[in-house]
Amino acid sequence: MATISKKKKKVKVTPEGAVHIKASFNNIMVTITDLQGNTVSWSSAGKNGFKGSKKNTPYASQITSEAAAKEAYDLGMRHVNVFIKGPGAGRDAAIRALQGAGLDVRTIKDITPLPHNGCRPPKRRRV
């Protein structure tokens, strides 16, 4: 039986782009796009082998950001603008990991959606 070889396309991207970090209470997702919004690379804590409550830790966000940044760096991206959304832990660790992977962080913008007294929040947990 013939084996199917999966060929990954090599795309040269522009050296500037945007990093979108979504840090929820349960997971962290990092998406790196070019200036038009086309996805260059992405990563999440679950994709990197973290399960359950370990997905929303600063260490998981560091590993996740490094994985996405390394892939984008190999494709030619050098300068990024960072957009952070969500209340999760490890937001700062994700930015530090991007800088450590060789990407030049130009701006950091918090785009967390805040309600103007919209929906009623869930009740308090009693543990």
UniProtKB/Swiss-Prot annotation:
Signal peptide position in this chain?
A: none
A Pfam family matched in the record: Ribosomal_S11
- GO aspect biological process, one term: translation
Its keywords, alphabetically, are:
Ribonucleoprotein, Ribosomal protein, RNA-binding, rRNA-binding
Spell out the molecular function terms from Gene Ontology: rRNA binding; structural constituent of ribosome
One Gene Ontology cellular component = ribosome
Its assembly, as annotated, is: Part of the 30S ribosomal subunit. Interacts with proteins S7 and S18. Binds to IF-3.
Q: What does this protein do?
A: Located on the platform of the 30S subunit, it bridges several disparate RNA helices of the 16S rRNA. Forms part of the Shine-Dalgarno cleft in the 70S ribosome.
The entry sums up its family as follows: Belongs to the universal ribosomal protein uS11 family.
| Protein's name in the database | Small ribosomal subunit protein uS11
**Organism of derivation:** Pelodictyon phaeoclathratiforme (strain DSM 5477 / BU-1)
Upper lineage: Bacteria, Pseudomonadati, Chlorobiota, Chlorobiia, Chlorobiales
Gene name? rpsK
